[in-house]
Amino acid sequence: MGRRIQGQRRGRGTSTFRAPSHRYKADLEHRKVEDGDVIAGTVVDIEHDPARSAPVAAVEFEDGDRRLILAPEGVGVGDELQVGVSAEIAPGNTLPLAEIPEGVPVCNVESSPGDGGKFARASGVNAQLLTHDRNVAVVKLPSGEMKRLDPQCRATIGVVAGGGRTDKPFVKAGNKHHKMKARGTKWPNVRGVAMNAVDHPFGGGGRQHPGKPKSISRNAPPGRKVGDIASKRTGRGGNE
């Protein structure tokens, strides 16, 4: 009987595989306002959140509410931000897609009205509002996908701060270790072909190779369910 593979250990749900969400600061949802109203707030601090790659801005609103938002590029301490239908078109302001001019870069875009923001939230990324009418708004996501959304979905104007983060190398394995530990990510990941035969279905042998077909049934038992799971096809392909 071989040892449990990593997928089986992950399913047990020990602390090794759980994200330390008790350290995360906030969900960074859009501030809710009444229809037609605009509420202003002042950026009082720029903070780091272990949950994400981008910096977050602490905003204190006129009514005393203080919350964290995703910080766009160009927003700093002391700046005034607005949330509402008639907010100004300026970086950091949040308003419905129907009120934003076409071609403007946006971030933290809602998937459905009122959900707080789901798309374009990583550092240095933005979505682009291509077109909108009374019934639908078309947004180009960072992946290139064209998303058709409700025009009442809200978004923050601007590009998420922290661009260029990936340009700086980790240099040392210790730096990478601390980053992964903050996220609760299992690291490093050892390849199955580099393991012993007792540790993985692809392990063992005089050289590193799977030693068996990588395609595997969807209904395979957990200890064998590695490789190309229920693949319709594998390889580079060619002309159909």
Swiss-Prot record:
The keyword RNA-binding applies. SUPFAM superfamilies: Nucleic acid-binding proteins (SSF50249), Translation proteins SH3-like domain (SSF50104). InterPro entries: NA-bd_OB-fold (IPR012340), Rib_uL2_dom2 (IPR014722), Ribosomal_uL2 (IPR002171), Ribosomal_uL2_arc_euk (IPR023672), Ribosomal_uL2_C (IPR022669), Ribosomal_uL2_CS (IPR022671), Ribosomal_uL2_dom3 (IPR014726), Ribosomal_uL2_RNA-bd_dom (IPR022666). Transmembrane segments: none annotated. Gene3D superfamilies: 2.30.30.30, Nucleic acid-binding proteins, Ribosomal protein L2, domain 3. SMART domains: Ribosomal_L2, Ribosomal_L2_C. This protein can be partially incorporated into E.coli polysomes in vivo, indicating it can replace the endogenous protein. Belongs to the universal ribosomal protein uL2 family. One of the primary rRNA binding proteins. Required for association of the 30S and 50S subunits to form the 70S ribosome, for tRNA binding and peptide bond formation. It has been suggested to have peptidyltransferase activity; this is somewhat controversial. Makes several contacts with the 16S rRNA in the 70S ribosome. Part of the 50S ribosomal subunit. Forms a bridge to the 30S subunit in the 70S ribosome. Interacts weakly with protein L37Ae. This is Large ribosomal subunit protein uL2.
